[in-house]
UniProtKB/Swiss-Prot annotation:
Pathway, per record: Secondary metabolite biosynthesis; flavonoid biosynthesis
GO molecular function terms listed in the Swiss-Prot or TrEMBL record: chalcone isomerase activity
Gene3D superfamilies in the record: 1.10.890.20, 3.50.70.10
Domain of life, source organism: Eukaryota
The UniProt record lists the keyword Isomerase: yes
EC number from the UniProt entry: 5.5.1.6
TM stretches of this protein: none
Function comment: Catalyzes the intramolecular cyclization of bicyclic chalcones into tricyclic (S)-flavanones. Responsible for the isomerization of 4,2',4',6'-tetrahydroxychalcone (also termed chalcone) into naringenin.
Catalytic activities: a chalcone = a flavanone
Induction: By light.
Organism: Arabidopsis thaliana
Record-given protein name: Chalcone--flavanone isomerase 1
Known outcome of mutating residue 202 to V: In strain: cv. Cha-0
Tissue expression: Mostly expressed in siliques and flowers, and, to a lower extent, in leaves.
Gene: CHI1
Length: 246
Protein backbone atom coordinates (compact mmCIF):
# COMPACT_ATOMS: atom_id res chain seq x y z
CA UNK A 1 0.00 0.00 0.00
CA UNK A 2 1.33 3.42 -0.93
CA UNK A 3 1.93 6.03 1.74
CA UNK A 4 -0.69 8.32 0.19
CA UNK A 5 -3.36 5.62 0.51
CA UNK A 6 -2.27 4.82 4.03
CA UNK A 7 -2.72 8.46 5.03
CA UNK A 8 -6.05 8.95 3.26
CA UNK A 9 -8.80 9.99 5.61
CA UNK A 10 -12.47 9.20 5.09
CA UNK A 11 -14.51 11.87 3.35
CA UNK A 12 -16.16 14.30 5.77
CA UNK A 13 -19.93 14.01 6.10
CA UNK A 14 -21.48 16.68 3.84
CA UNK A 15 -22.71 19.74 5.74
CA UNK A 16 -26.07 20.68 4.22
CA UNK A 17 -29.08 22.73 5.26
CA UNK A 18 -32.67 21.64 5.74
CA UNK A 19 -35.17 22.23 2.94
CA UNK A 20 -38.74 23.51 3.19
CA UNK A 21 -40.97 22.32 0.36
CA UNK A 22 -44.66 23.24 0.32
CA UNK A 23 -44.84 23.46 4.15
CA UNK A 24 -42.96 20.15 4.61
CA UNK A 25 -39.53 20.35 6.25
CA UNK A 26 -36.76 17.90 5.38
CA UNK A 27 -34.01 17.83 8.02
CA UNK A 28 -30.33 17.96 6.94
CA UNK A 29 -29.61 14.35 7.93
CA UNK A 30 -31.41 11.18 9.01
CA UNK A 31 -30.52 7.71 10.28
CA UNK A 32 -31.46 4.97 7.87
CA UNK A 33 -34.01 2.47 9.24
CA UNK A 34 -32.13 -0.21 7.29
CA UNK A 35 -28.59 0.35 8.58
CA UNK A 36 -28.62 3.21 11.14
CA UNK A 37 -26.10 4.98 8.88
CA UNK A 38 -26.32 8.79 8.78
CA UNK A 39 -27.51 10.05 5.40
CA UNK A 40 -27.50 13.66 4.15
CA UNK A 41 -30.32 15.47 2.36
CA UNK A 42 -29.55 15.35 -1.36
CA UNK A 43 -32.64 17.24 -2.49
CA UNK A 44 -36.42 17.55 -2.26
CA UNK A 45 -39.41 18.48 -4.39
CA UNK A 46 -43.10 17.90 -5.04
CA UNK A 47 -45.03 15.35 -7.04
CA UNK A 48 -48.18 16.69 -8.60
CA UNK A 49 -50.43 16.72 -11.63
CA UNK A 50 -52.11 19.40 -13.66
CA UNK A 51 -55.83 18.81 -13.14
CA UNK A 52 -58.23 21.05 -15.09
CA UNK A 53 -55.66 23.82 -15.30
CA UNK A 54 -54.62 23.65 -11.64
CA UNK A 55 -51.41 22.03 -10.37
CA UNK A 56 -52.40 19.66 -7.56
CA UNK A 57 -49.64 18.43 -5.22
CA UNK A 58 -50.08 14.85 -3.99
CA UNK A 59 -46.78 14.20 -2.20
CA UNK A 60 -43.56 15.96 -1.22
CA UNK A 61 -40.39 13.89 -1.62
CA UNK A 62 -36.95 14.08 0.01
CA UNK A 63 -33.95 12.05 -1.19
CA UNK A 64 -31.08 11.32 1.21
CA UNK A 65 -27.68 9.85 0.31
CA UNK A 66 -24.77 8.25 2.14
CA UNK A 67 -21.78 10.57 2.62
CA UNK A 68 -19.52 8.65 0.24
CA UNK A 69 -21.89 9.49 -2.62
CA UNK A 70 -20.16 12.86 -3.05
CA UNK A 71 -16.58 11.62 -3.68
CA UNK A 72 -17.95 8.67 -5.67
CA UNK A 73 -19.93 10.93 -8.02
CA UNK A 74 -17.19 13.57 -8.09
CA UNK A 75 -14.86 11.30 -10.07
CA UNK A 76 -16.91 11.86 -13.22
CA UNK A 77 -19.23 14.78 -12.49
CA UNK A 78 -17.35 17.42 -10.47
CA UNK A 79 -17.32 20.83 -12.11
CA UNK A 80 -20.63 20.26 -13.90
CA UNK A 81 -23.30 22.93 -13.49
CA UNK A 82 -26.77 22.34 -12.06
CA UNK A 83 -28.20 22.63 -15.58
CA UNK A 84 -25.75 20.09 -17.01
CA UNK A 85 -26.48 17.58 -14.25
CA UNK A 86 -30.25 18.08 -14.44
CA UNK A 87 -30.21 17.21 -18.15
CA UNK A 88 -27.83 14.25 -17.75
CA UNK A 89 -29.47 10.83 -17.84
CA UNK A 90 -26.15 9.04 -17.01
CA UNK A 91 -25.66 11.21 -13.90
CA UNK A 92 -28.97 10.17 -12.38
CA UNK A 93 -28.42 6.56 -13.44
CA UNK A 94 -25.16 6.69 -11.48
CA UNK A 95 -27.01 7.98 -8.41
CA UNK A 96 -29.62 5.24 -8.79
CA UNK A 97 -27.08 2.42 -9.28
CA UNK A 98 -24.18 3.78 -7.18
CA UNK A 99 -22.63 1.70 -4.38
CA UNK A 100 -23.90 3.93 -1.57
CA UNK A 101 -27.05 3.90 0.52
CA UNK A 102 -30.08 6.00 -0.43
CA UNK A 103 -33.21 6.90 1.50
CA UNK A 104 -36.49 8.33 0.22
CA UNK A 105 -39.13 10.06 2.33
CA UNK A 106 -42.50 10.52 0.63
CA UNK A 107 -44.82 12.75 2.68
CA UNK A 108 -48.53 12.98 1.85
CA UNK A 109 -50.22 16.28 1.05
CA UNK A 110 -53.46 14.56 0.05
CA UNK A 111 -54.80 11.27 1.43
CA UNK A 112 -53.85 8.14 -0.50
CA UNK A 113 -54.57 4.46 0.00
CA UNK A 114 -51.70 2.00 -0.03
CA UNK A 115 -53.24 0.35 -3.06
CA UNK A 116 -53.39 3.63 -5.02
CA UNK A 117 -49.78 4.46 -4.18
CA UNK A 118 -48.24 1.02 -4.72
CA UNK A 119 -50.03 0.37 -8.01
CA UNK A 120 -48.77 3.66 -9.47
CA UNK A 121 -45.20 3.06 -8.23
CA UNK A 122 -45.02 -0.48 -9.59
CA UNK A 123 -46.56 0.62 -12.90
CA UNK A 124 -43.71 3.14 -13.24
CA UNK A 125 -41.11 0.54 -12.21
CA UNK A 126 -42.34 -2.00 -14.77
CA UNK A 127 -42.22 0.69 -17.48
CA UNK A 128 -38.57 1.40 -16.58
CA UNK A 129 -37.64 -2.30 -16.65
CA UNK A 130 -39.33 -2.92 -19.98
CA UNK A 131 -37.53 0.09 -21.44
CA UNK A 132 -34.22 -1.37 -20.20
CA UNK A 133 -35.14 -4.93 -21.23
CA UNK A 134 -34.79 -6.19 -17.65
CA UNK A 135 -38.25 -7.46 -16.66
CA UNK A 136 -38.08 -11.07 -15.38
CA UNK A 137 -40.01 -13.41 -13.07
CA UNK A 138 -37.88 -12.19 -10.15
CA UNK A 139 -39.08 -8.63 -10.70
CA UNK A 140 -42.70 -9.79 -11.11
CA UNK A 141 -42.48 -11.53 -7.70
CA UNK A 142 -40.90 -8.44 -6.14
CA UNK A 143 -43.80 -6.35 -7.47
CA UNK A 144 -46.30 -8.79 -5.92
CA UNK A 145 -44.58 -8.47 -2.54
CA UNK A 146 -44.49 -4.67 -2.84
CA UNK A 147 -48.23 -4.53 -3.56
CA UNK A 148 -48.94 -6.89 -0.65
CA UNK A 149 -47.03 -4.67 1.83
CA UNK A 150 -49.20 -1.66 0.94
CA UNK A 151 -52.55 -3.41 0.43
CA UNK A 152 -54.14 -2.66 3.82
CA UNK A 153 -52.47 0.71 4.44
CA UNK A 154 -53.95 4.22 4.30
CA UNK A 155 -51.92 7.41 4.32
CA UNK A 156 -53.55 10.61 5.61
CA UNK A 157 -51.97 14.03 4.98
CA UNK A 158 -48.73 14.41 6.97
CA UNK A 159 -47.95 10.68 7.05
CA UNK A 160 -44.92 9.33 5.20
CA UNK A 161 -43.78 6.33 3.21
CA UNK A 162 -40.08 5.59 3.65
CA UNK A 163 -37.71 3.58 1.47
CA UNK A 164 -34.11 2.64 2.32
CA UNK A 165 -32.02 1.32 -0.58
CA UNK A 166 -28.93 -0.62 0.46
CA UNK A 167 -25.81 -0.81 -1.76
CA UNK A 168 -26.35 -4.59 -1.95
CA UNK A 169 -29.78 -4.14 -3.48
CA UNK A 170 -32.35 -4.63 -0.72
CA UNK A 171 -35.35 -2.31 -0.39
CA UNK A 172 -36.51 -1.64 3.18
CA UNK A 173 -40.02 -0.20 3.50
CA UNK A 174 -41.25 1.74 6.54
CA UNK A 175 -44.27 3.90 7.37
CA UNK A 176 -44.63 6.92 9.64
CA UNK A 177 -47.83 8.62 10.76
CA UNK A 178 -45.97 11.83 11.59
CA UNK A 179 -42.60 13.44 10.87
CA UNK A 180 -40.59 10.80 12.74
CA UNK A 181 -38.48 8.11 11.08
CA UNK A 182 -38.74 4.62 12.65
CA UNK A 183 -35.56 2.82 13.65
CA UNK A 184 -36.47 -0.27 11.63
CA UNK A 185 -38.58 -1.08 8.59
CA UNK A 186 -41.70 -3.22 8.39
CA UNK A 187 -40.56 -5.25 5.38
CA UNK A 188 -37.51 -5.91 3.22
CA UNK A 189 -37.62 -6.88 -0.45
CA UNK A 190 -34.41 -8.41 -1.78
CA UNK A 191 -34.51 -7.15 -5.34
CA UNK A 192 -31.91 -4.69 -6.58
CA UNK A 193 -33.82 -3.70 -9.71
CA UNK A 194 -36.94 -2.85 -7.71
CA UNK A 195 -34.95 -0.77 -5.22
CA UNK A 196 -33.31 1.14 -8.06
CA UNK A 197 -36.53 1.57 -10.03
CA UNK A 198 -38.35 3.12 -7.04
CA UNK A 199 -35.72 5.89 -6.96
CA UNK A 200 -35.48 6.17 -10.74
CA UNK A 201 -39.25 6.58 -10.99
CA UNK A 202 -38.83 9.76 -8.91
CA UNK A 203 -35.64 11.39 -10.22
CA UNK A 204 -34.96 9.56 -13.49
CA UNK A 205 -35.50 10.71 -17.08
CA UNK A 206 -39.30 10.48 -16.88
CA UNK A 207 -39.51 10.71 -13.09
CA UNK A 208 -42.62 11.88 -11.29
CA UNK A 209 -40.82 14.73 -9.50
CA UNK A 210 -38.80 17.03 -11.78
CA UNK A 211 -38.46 19.39 -8.79
CA UNK A 212 -36.66 16.74 -6.75
CA UNK A 213 -34.41 15.97 -9.72
CA UNK A 214 -33.48 19.66 -10.06
CA UNK A 215 -32.91 19.99 -6.29
CA UNK A 216 -30.60 16.94 -6.22
CA UNK A 217 -28.63 18.25 -9.21
CA UNK A 218 -28.24 21.69 -7.63
CA UNK A 219 -27.14 20.40 -4.24
CA UNK A 220 -24.73 17.77 -5.60
CA UNK A 221 -23.20 20.25 -8.04
CA UNK A 222 -22.34 22.50 -5.08
CA UNK A 223 -21.15 19.63 -2.86
CA UNK A 224 -18.91 18.15 -5.56
CA UNK A 225 -17.33 21.55 -6.20
CA UNK A 226 -16.71 21.95 -2.45
CA UNK A 227 -15.29 18.40 -2.30
CA UNK A 228 -12.98 19.21 -5.24
CA UNK A 229 -11.72 22.40 -3.56
CA UNK A 230 -11.13 20.62 -0.24
CA UNK A 231 -9.27 17.77 -1.98
CA UNK A 232 -7.02 20.24 -3.80
CA UNK A 233 -6.20 22.00 -0.51
CA UNK A 234 -5.55 18.61 1.14
CA UNK A 235 -3.33 17.42 -1.73
CA UNK A 236 -1.38 20.69 -1.61
CA UNK A 237 -0.85 20.28 2.15
CA UNK A 238 0.45 16.73 1.66
CA UNK A 239 2.85 17.92 -1.05
CA UNK A 240 4.16 20.69 1.24
CA UNK A 241 4.61 18.19 4.09
CA UNK A 242 6.51 15.75 1.86
CA UNK A 243 8.68 18.58 0.51
CA UNK A 244 9.63 19.62 4.04
CA UNK A 245 10.41 16.02 5.03
CA UNK A 246 12.68 15.64 2.00
Amino acid sequence: MSSSNACASPSPFPAVTKLHVDSVTFVPSVKSPASSNPLFLGGAGVRGLDIQGKFVIFTVIGVYLEGNAVPSLSVKWKGKTTEELTESIPFFREIVTGAFEKFIKVTMKLPLTGQQYSEKVTENCVAIWKQLGLYTDCEAKAVEKFLEIFKEETFPPGSSILFALSPTGSLTVAFSKDDSIPETGIAVIENKLLAEAVLESIIGKNGVSPGTRLSVAERLSQLMMKNKDEKEVSDHSVEEKLAKEN
